[in-house]
A protein has these predicted regions:
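Short, structured coil segments at secondary-structure junctions
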Residues: 48, 101-102, 122
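Alpha-helical segments flanking ligand/cofactor-binding loops in enzyme cores
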Residues: 43, 70, 74, 96, ...
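A short beta-strand-loop structural module common to alpha/beta enzyme folds
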Residues: 51-62
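Glycine-rich phosphate/diphosphate-binding loop of Rossmann-like nucleotide-binding domains
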Residues: 27-52
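Helix-adjacent hinge/juxtasegments
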Residues: 68-108
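C-terminal binding/interaction regions
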Residues: 2-13, 21-29, 33-34, 112-174
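Residues that form or flank phosphate/diphosphate-binding pockets in enzymes
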Residues: 36-37, 63, 93, 137
Length: 174
């Protein structure tokens, strides 16, 4: 796994396809609270036909979610992963971390509707889940919905462009 602190922030291309392989790769990570759910989801995501890149953690020992949320985001913005999924206790903290990374549009989903909306309306490329808030069956439904829902474009594209404009406006070179 890459060290999270080595990432250079700056304008990054937003990949629309996987640049390493024709098969779509999903980067996935978790803290200790999401480890068991991550393990189950890796198998499920592979069953759906995707490649999986595991960004850690590798056990239930207490770790800091920002490190793993950033590692997943790095895979997405570099183009090594098509999309990213991060699981922590509530899904909120990891979503906040990921949305600090230029080019990431992270959404926390807790049901079918929020997963579909995040893709169709907001073109989210990063999903966060709260292992303490949802069970594995709900998580599988959310992940499948999120991975298979296409961006709606049209009137939503203008709004996503505005999100990107806000990002550019406040982006500071490091």
């Amino acid at each position: 796994m890459q060290e999270a602190g080595r990432m250079q922030l700056g304008p990054a291309p937003i990949p629309t396809t996987n640049t390493i392989s024709d098969k779509k790769t999903i980067a996935i990570g978790a803290d200790h609270g999401g480890y068991e759910m991550k393990t189950a989801l890796i198998e499920y995501i592979r069953e759906l036909g995707y490649e999986v890149f595991d960004c850690g953690t590798s056990g239930k020992e207490a770790v800091d979610y920002p490190d793993f949320a950033l590692a997943v985001a790095e895979q997405v913005i570099s183009g090594r992963a098509w999309r990213g999924i991060m699981i922590d206790g509530a899904g909120i903290g990891s979503c906040m971390v990921a949305n600090k990374v230029p080019g990431i549009r992270a959404a926390m989903a807790y049901d079918y509707a929020s997963a579909a909306n995040s893709r169709e309306h907001n073109n989210a490329n990063y999903l966060t889940l709260g292992a303490g808030l949802i069970g594995i069956n709900q998580a599988k439904l959310i992940v499948k919905t999120w991975l298979t829902t296409e961006f709606g474009g049209g009137r939503h594209q203008k709004r996503v462009d505005k999100i990107m404009g806000v990002e550019k406006r406040f982006l500071k070179e490091g």
